[in-house]
């Protein structure tokens, strides 16, 4: 049944909010994600179709009605907002159809009325937006306060707004997932491949010109780092500064005394500093910026920022950077930036390699790097396709959850109507008593209860599918973290090719030329030759010192590339793939077992459903 669901509006059209701009109908990845084109403006009124759409147009024709309905949506009662916050835990502004059905099921309205309310507000979509959700709550109030709950419509709602009571609902807890996913989604995403704790020996020093870590370069992988990873939580603060500036609340379980607020520009500043300090380290990609972003774009960027900070706090060198520590802990970050000059010198100027570190660099390092460089584009392409296919699967799973909720509503409505359709429910002339009576039919009553049990079964199926959506979202973030690792090393190769170049050969030729000139001046011994020789010798000494510094930088760059390849990339690649897929298989196995339990329980319940 669900293998080939019917086409529905906005059900299967997947677009990556961080990869596509607002152009409608564009193929995946065709447009520049850094484009400043505004996002499409979301609808401010509930989406309705056919009959309900015509009612909406009739309302629009009357200015007072339009103003009243929009007034409810734009300035809803506190209860409406509270219910939305309980169901929309991720802050996307949308609520799943299954969650809305569970909430409306506590209204004590007939199943037929609940189905009609959801039909008026959602039609064929798998989620309800904020305006649609508020409209559904208002329809519940209208149905509860009307003599005939079935006699509801958008037009009647508009006429009744002035004296509309609050809905009587008892929200239940959202379906919980397994303990492995019980932590917040934000904390569970962004797979950390290194222990994020700061070593006790790490110190941070600051003066008028510098602010950097004094911790030496780590050259060995840490044991069992995945047992105690640093968890980073990033949430979008609803309030804005100005008309387009969003702030993010950042919290770490291992640093600081509480959450801190940061703007997107602060992330840009941090990555700019880290790229200048650590050009030969793996740096995670920074998500793009967009003017007038959509809610989907903001949510995708929030998750990308979690992955970025999780990677930085997992990296054995970057996690000890003092600027990163201040970024994650300082409550007055903006004032600190203004009063503290931050050094952006390369780490090679402040860190020296030990003899053991220099000797650990393999002589065939270039061959090892070339081997990865040749295969990196293919790996990156495969991971990109995996992410796209997983997100398409997520859309299909969301549609299945919505369809299960619709199946539950329809079957429960049928269960209520079956006994009423029986001929025995009609009052007639009883030959024996001579008066009209309506008799109960045991067969139809039993069949109706069976239909109700089937509806309850579909409710359970919808809840399990919703849990599956949450699990799949977590594993998609794991896949994106793995993809980001390959993308980050690809960017590292680009920086290495660009920034590892030096002018040692030019300086050597210049020193050799001066040496020859000095020898000729000494042989000629013309007047004033001593001063000219001293001048040339001083210049040669400066160039020789620069050559020594650049040669030491070459060795340091090679050590960095070897460390990133053999320790960071090698360990992260293995751990992310192994643990990510193990968790995925375990979650899928448990979800399948729970679904089988639902069907088995329904099978046992339907044994008592009468046939005749």
Swiss-Prot record:
Residues 226-334 form the PX domain. It is a peripheral membrane protein. One of its GO terms (biological process) is intracellular protein transport. A 1,2-diacyl-sn-glycero-3-phospho-(1D-myo-inositol-3-phosphate) binds at residues 263, 265, 289, 301. One of its GO terms (cellular component) is cytosol. The keyword Thylakoid does not apply. Residues 35-68 are annotated as: Disordered. The keyword Transport applies. GO terms for molecular function: phosphatidylinositol binding. Keywords: Cytoplasm, Membrane, Protein transport, Transport. Transmembrane segments: none annotated. It is found in: Cytoplasm; Membrane. It holds the Pfam family Snx8_BAR_dom. Its main location: cytoplasm. Belongs to the sorting nexin family. PANTHER family: SORTING NEXIN-8. Required for vacuolar protein sorting. The PX domain binds phosphatidylinositol 3-phosphate which is necessary for peripheral membrane localization. This is Sorting nexin MVP1. The lineage of its organism: Eukaryota, Fungi, Dikarya, Basidiomycota, Agaricomycotina.
């Amino acid at each position: 049944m669900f293998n080939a669901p019917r086409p529905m509006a906005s059900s299967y059209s997947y677009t990556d909010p961080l990869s596509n701009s607002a152009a409608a109908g564009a193929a995946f990845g065709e447009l520049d994600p850094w484009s400043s084109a505004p996002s499409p403006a979301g609808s401010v009124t509930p989406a309705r179709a056919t009959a309900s759409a015509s009612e909406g147009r009739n309302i629009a024709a009357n200015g007072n009605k339009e103003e009243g309905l929009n007034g409810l949506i734009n300035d809803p009662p506190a209860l409406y907002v509270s219910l939305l916050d309980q169901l929309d835990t991720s802050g996307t502004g949308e609520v799943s159809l299954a969650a809305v059905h569970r909430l409306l099921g506590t209204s004590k309205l007939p199943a037929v009325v609940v189905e009609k309310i959801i039909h008026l507000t959602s039609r064929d979509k798998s989620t309800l937006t904020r305006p649609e959700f508020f409209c559904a709550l208002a329809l519940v109030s209208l149905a509860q306060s009307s003599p005939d709950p079935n006699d509801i419509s958008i037009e009647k709602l508009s006429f009744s707004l002035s004296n509309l009571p609050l809905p009587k609902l008892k929200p239940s807890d959202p379906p919980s997932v397994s303990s492995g996913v019980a932590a917040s989604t934000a904390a569970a995403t962004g797979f950390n491949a290194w222990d994020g704790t700061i070593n006790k020996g790490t110190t941070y020093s600051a003066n008028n010109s510098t602010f950097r870590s004094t911790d030496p370069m780590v050259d060995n992988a840490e044991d069992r780092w995945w047992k105690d990873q640093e968890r980073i939580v990033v949430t979008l603060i609803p309030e804005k500064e100005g008309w387009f500036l969003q702030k993010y609340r950042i919290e770490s379980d291992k640093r600081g005394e509480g959450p801190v607020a940061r703007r997107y520009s602060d992330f840009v500043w941090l990555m700019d500093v880290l790229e200048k300090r650590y050009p030969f380290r793996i740096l995670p990609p920074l998500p793009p910026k967009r003017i007038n972003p959509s809610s989907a774009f903001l949510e995708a960027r929030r998750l990308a920022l979690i992955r970025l900070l999780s990677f930085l706090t997992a990296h054995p060198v970057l996690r000890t950077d003092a600027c990163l520590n201040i970024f994650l802990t300082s409550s007055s970050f903006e004032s600190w930036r203004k009063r503290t000059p931050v050094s952006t010198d390369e780490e090679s100027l402040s860190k020296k390699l030990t003899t053991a570190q220099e000797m650990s660099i393999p002589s065939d390092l270039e061959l090892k790097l070339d081997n990865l460089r040749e295969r990196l584009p293919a790996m990156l392409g495969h991971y990109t396709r995996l992410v796209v296919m997983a997100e398409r699967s997520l859309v299909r799973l969301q549609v299945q959850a919505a369809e299960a909720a619709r199946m539950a509503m329809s079957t429960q409505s049928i269960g209520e109507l079956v006994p009423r359709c029986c001929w025995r429910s009609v009052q007639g002339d009883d030959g024996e008593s001579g008066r009209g009576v309506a008799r109960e039919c045991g067969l139809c009553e039993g069949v109706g209860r069976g239909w109700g049990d089937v509806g309850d079964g579909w409710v359970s199926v919808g809840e399990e599918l919703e849990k599956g959506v949450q699990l799949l979202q977590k594993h998609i973030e794991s896949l994106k973290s793995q993809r980001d690792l390959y993308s980050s090393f690809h960017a590292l190769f680009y920086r290495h090719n660009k920034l590892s170049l030096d002018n040692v050969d030019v300086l050597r030729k210049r020193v050799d030329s001066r040496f020859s000139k000095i020898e000729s001046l000494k042989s000629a011994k013309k007047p004033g030759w001593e001063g000219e020789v001293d001048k040339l010798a001083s210049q040669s000494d400066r160039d020789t010192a620069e050559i020594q510094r650049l040669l030491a930088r070459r060795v340091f760059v090679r050590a960095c590339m070897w460390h990133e390849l053999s320790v960071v990339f090698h360990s992260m690649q293995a751990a992310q793939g192994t643990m990510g897929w193990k968790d995925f298989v375990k979650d899928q196995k448990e979800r399948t077992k729970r679904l089988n339990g639902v069907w088995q329980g329904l099978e046992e319940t339907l044994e008592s459903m009468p046939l005749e």
